[in-house]
Amino acid sequence: MAQFQQTIDMQTLQAAAGRNSLVNDLASRRVYDNAVEELNARSRRPKVHFSKAVSTEQTLIATNAYPEFEISFTHTQSAVHSLAGGLRSLELEYLMMQVPFGSLTYDIGGNFSAHLFKGRDYVHCCMPNLDVRDIARHEGHKEAIYSYVNRLKRQQRPVPEYQRAAFNNYAENPHFVHCDKPFQQCELTTAYGTDTYAVALHSIYDIPVEEFGSALLRKNVKTCFAAFHFHENMLLDCDTVTLDEIGATFQKSGDNLSFFFHNESTLNYTHSFSNIIKYVCKTFFPASQRFVYHKEFLVTRVNTWYCKFTRVDTFTLFRGVYHNNVDCEEFYKAMDDAWHYKKTLAMLNAERTIFKDNAALNFWFPKVRDMVIVPLFDASITTGRMSRREIMVNKDFVYTVLNHIKTYQAKALTYANVLSFVESIRSRVIINGVTARSEWDTDKAILGPLAMTFFLITKLGHVQDEIILKKFQKFDRTTNELIWTSLCDALMGVIPSVKETLVRGGFVKVAEQALEIKVPELYCTFADRLVLQYKKAEEFQSCDLSKPLEESEKYYNALSELSVLENLDSFDLEAFKTLCQQKNVDPDMAAKVVVAIMKSELTLPFKKPTEEEISESLKPGEGSCAEHKEVLSLQNDAPFPCVKNLVEGSVPAYGMCPKGGGFDKLDVDIADFHLKSVDAVKKGTMMSAVYTGSIKVQQMKNYIDYLSASLAATVSNLCKVLRDVHGVDPESQEKSGVWDVRRGRWLLKPNAKSHAWGVAEDANHKLVIVLLNWDDGKPVCDETWFRVAVSSDSLIYSDMGKLKTLTSCSPNGEPPEPNAKVILVDGVPGCGKTKEIIEKVNFSEDLILVPGKEASKMIIRRANQAGVIRADKDNVRTVDSFLMHPSRRVFKRLFIDEGLMLHTGCVNFLLLLSQCDVAYVYGDTKQIPFICRVANFPYPAHFAKLVADEKEVRRVTLRCPADVTYFLNKKYDGAVMCTSAVERSVKAEVVRGKGALNPITLPLEGKILTFTQADKFELLEKGYKDVNTVHEVQGETYEKTAIVRLTSTPLEIISSASPHVLVALTRHTTCCKYYTVVLDPMVNVISEMEKLSNFLLDMYRVEAGVQYQLQIDAVFRDSNLFVQTPKSGDWRDMQFYYDALLPGNSTILNEFDAVTMNLRDISLNVKDCRIDFSKSVQLPKEQPIFLKPKIRTAAEMPRTAGLLENLVAMIKRNMNAPDLTGTIDIEDTASLVVEKFWDSYVDKEFSGTNEMTMTRESFSRWLSKQESSTVGQLADFNFVDLPAVDEYKHMIKSQPKQKLDLSIQDEYPALQTIVYHSKKINAIFGPMFSELTRMLLERIDSSKFLFYTRKTPAQIEDFFSDLDSTQAMEILELDISKYDKSQNEFHCAVEYKIWEKLGIDEWLAEVWKQGHRKTTLKDYTAGVKTCLWYQRKSGDVTTFIGNTIIIAACLSSMIPMDKVIKAAFCGDDSLIYIPKGLDLPDIQAGANLMWNFEAKLFRKKYGYFCGRYVIHHDRGAIVYYDPLKLISKLGCKHIRDVVHLEELRESLCDVASNLNNCAYFSQLDEAVAEVHKTAVGGSFAFCSIIKYLSDKRLFRDLFFV
């Protein structure tokens, strides 16, 4: 023990000496934590903007004086007395901090504009015009308001939300905001008994003290906070007092006290000195016989004194403090009234029960320390009179001078010598023989009178010294003494000493007193007395805490309820409390719902279980659930009348179904759908507004709702087709079709026949669902029908039949919970699941269910291959067949193959309908799960998990080779083994563009697989056979597979963790080859498998012996600072930079690619079109000569329009449109998307719908933007009839667009196309959509969202300049390929609904809509004519704004825009800044299924928008034009001559102006490296760009002939 104690003592000593590193680290960590806490606390302080230009010392004064605020010094405004003026805002904010927020407050003499800017709608300013200066000051306040409003109007920004209530109050009731009466006469009234507050900032000087208390009481002011300038020296009877910190002066003349700022010419303010002294020295301010306002000082800051006046009820004084005493005033009054009575009677009348209080106020004068009061004398030449005054001078200075000049001889003691010495010692002193600056800073103006006083005092001192010496040397009397002696003897001692008495009484002034030097007192005490007469006693009122205590009890109970949650730490209790208060929700009820949701006992179908969503769901609403008929709403935040209408404190045991929900009876036959109104199917089909019950029951309800939503979406789309089709189009082959019953022909021809059902329009234009029969390829229709619509989704009764069955077995909307035991068999790919099912099943009593027909036929064939018929269509069925026509048999066991690809509710219904005892669900947890195909339908994560009683695993694959088994081991728990003898089976090949893939030059061996439907259709059009997507072949086995990727844009489903990659690599048994146009994660996976050694591959075979585990570790920052970019470098620096970022592009010899394409044979996959081959031969033209660039890039020569060029461009830009969309109810979903768009982007003030009015001015605005040639084409247009709106002209741009990637090395880039209307159509619709665009942009919240239309680069930079770099945020970019041609009927519906909300004319809107539905393209140059459905036309009047609207609507439907910091949209470009950690949905899946976009979401550190890098930093943001794009333009090959070259230079100078600022080149390098992985530091190249752009001669050297 002794040794142990000794060790402890040694360690303690080492820690104390700082030699213990662990203790030092702990101490450093503690200091760091304390610093972080302090900085966080400081950042939460109120922020004050200090715009006045002040010095560094004054900045420290303001910061140290007001630590409560975080002061931002911008130094943007130079003004008189800038420090005092800037402190005014701090003083006002400090006073308002003392007032409870929202309480009615009187600002005595206040500035109402300051309160408006702060959004305080509860402040009334009493602003009397006591002189002309007050009127001018108040006009300045109004000017500030006008300037602010005009600035907002100029910037097209609305009044901010926090200011809106105050500005509305000022606009509607200005008399509440301010009045022109003094505070004592203010006429604003409040509710009786309501306490108010008051603040007085430098305004109580002008209120008489006698009126102040009564004025406060008249307004029922509880507390008044005041601030005023003062200085203690004013109590010393000084005529002038200087306030050094703010540079001001008080000057007293009689009772007038003047205040002014020195060192500048400003106004002078005059007040009553006696009135101010009373405010300073008094403590009690009587208001009535009952109430008194008690004053106490709070703090003194920068020459400003703060005090507080508190209303005191004297009736609450303790009775014992009163005493019977004589009130002096009453005594004198009684004596006057009754002088003839006795004194005793007068005393009795004056006796009262009174209370006396005495308050003493001490003032400390710190500047009088070491000071003395010295008299000064002035004489008048005219009158001969002498005046005397006093000043304070440094004590040490005075006695140093007096002691020195007392040493002068009588001849040397002259006034001139004294003045000379005083002047010299004031300016310098000699210390150790060295001259130094004097420490006494005495005013030079008083040195003359002060020297005279010193001279007189010294003279008097010499006389006194002589008298003393004579007293000691001679004992005789002087003549003066003899006179006094004679006078005293004559008076004979009546007064002991007449001389002393006369002097003491002031009748006689002696020299000693006139020249006396006095020492001032450091403290001065002022007493204030209060006398109260006893009138009444009342009890002191206590604070009412019952309400907050009751609320605390509720939240305590709610916390107790929430304590059962496992992850309570991650639950934001503070947010829960705040939202319950905002939504007016009972916390206990909300807590019960939270627990139920977290335990999966309750589910809000269309909401996430967050604090905000739960509070919103529980918010009290009007009416009951039965009143809400339209419950199904396809959006993520659809409002549900759910738990908020339940009985308080209880959770229901069953789901609530609104009126009209479900079907009228349980046993519904499919025939009941015939002639059923479409509204009955589209509305009210939700099983439950709130999912309750066990998790299995909730999954089953969700599955029924999923079928209902799918059917409703299909019916809605058929209704839309009926409304949209007007003309005849017998040549079309689309998914939808419309049959004209009366004419007996197809108005819109479908690509399939024999549909099971459709939607019919009868003679009354009523839409009903009809079941169809067919005769010779034509539907058999009732004669009362007008038209019938069908689609590919109505080919079979699938959804109807399943709904019939499932609703029949769900009485009262509550499906019974299945009791079967569920065994989940989780097997790796190829583990023999199907083989195991066939071996284990007893076909006489068991049932096998599979997803598709081919799988059921395969199982029947394999089970019966021995010759004995065991399997048939009764015991081996598809899931859809069984759900539509369930068997009446009772099965003992159920086997479901690929059960994890099914909706979990579907699996539970299969268990229920089969009535089995045990169910074996075979699947793979790592492969592709069930994918919800109905856009925006909720399928929560806890619903996707199958509830199983047992789980078995199969980890031996019979299909996969050894190299794939290695890949599987990284995906599954436990060791995965294989039985295959094949060791190496996978290869990857990067092809040089999708054009390299065709059946002739590159035949693909085995089953062809793709990841997307677009790639699948493109391969089929190229001529390949037997092509499927990976999702379609899950569960299948092939000997050889060929996986193809044609999409060059990033795909989220192709990643190392994607289940699609797992399925794709596990379909083969011997060989798999991956063909891709880009390097992607799957290439890396295959490359890793190819590098494996045979030793490692042997480990994964079942026959392998001892297994060896090898482990291999992987080896492997509001205004911009400006620094001028040096103009240095050479053009070769730009070449090097280009080659580093795009290696290989500069070596491409593409000058004759166009010639080669026209001369050689070519194979094109062309959609239906008409071609005039007479245009295939181009007329010979003289080729122009272009300048050649020194910088080698991938730029191409201009091309000549012709049949092949135009046709290739048309195929690339307009044909082969992707079709990725799932099942969407176009009309309803479009309405929801538009509402979300409106809520997200449009300012609430302009959220209503207006009627658009076309005026002459709007047409003139459009006409002024048109070229003269365009106006000339309209000269012969009579505007009587419309040209064909559905006919477009087609042309190409001659210059190919340069891509900043490596695709030029493998592809022949197609030209950009222009699809445009005639000028006559543009003249009609152009002004209309220009006006609609203007109306829309006016409504956009421009402070948060940027719609990049007619904006300059400087405006982009200004928009992003207020980004806070200290805030943790993420930057999102949505990259969409094939943007224009991906837009289909849904996109058009969204755009039209937005125009409708802006008030577009209905007739013109319908014409425009029909003109964009089915359109005809004619290319007269190439002789090509084709037909397109929908798509965005590149030369339309709505092309740019329409594309911008669509990308904004797309993102608002998937991203919570209310949480977005900044967002910008331009065409297909988008840039979004969101807080870091925000929970986002699957953007890529939403873009595919709902918006038909091939999209990829990038998360970056810096934004990239419209070819510019947005670099945000701690001072704002700077926008750099893409330097790589700039260098690419310097390598262009279409420059005609020197004039054209100079035009190019000027345009590049405009866009690249910010490259002149090199302060943020390091951040620019980081941003470029995010896009181009091979990027190097580019400062040298940027300097070279600026050098050549800024010099005409050097720029010309970049090109040669």
From Swiss-Prot:
InterPro entries: (+)RNA_virus_helicase_core_dom, Alphavirus-like_MT_dom, DNA/RNA_pol_sf, P-loop_NTPase, RNA-dep_RNA_pol_alsuvir, RNA-dir_pol_PSvirus, ToMV_Hel_N, Virgaviridae_RdRp. It catalyses: RNA(n) + a ribonucleoside 5'-triphosphate = RNA(n+1) + diphosphate; ATP + H2O = ADP + phosphate + H(+). Residues 72-280 form the Alphavirus-like MT domain. Its EC number is 2.1.1.-, 2.7.7.-, 2.7.7.48, 3.6.4.13. It comes from the Viruses. GO terms for biological process: DNA-templated transcription; mRNA modification; RNA processing; symbiont-mediated suppression of host innate immune response; viral RNA genome replication. This is Replicase large subunit. It comes from Turnip vein-clearing virus (TVCV).
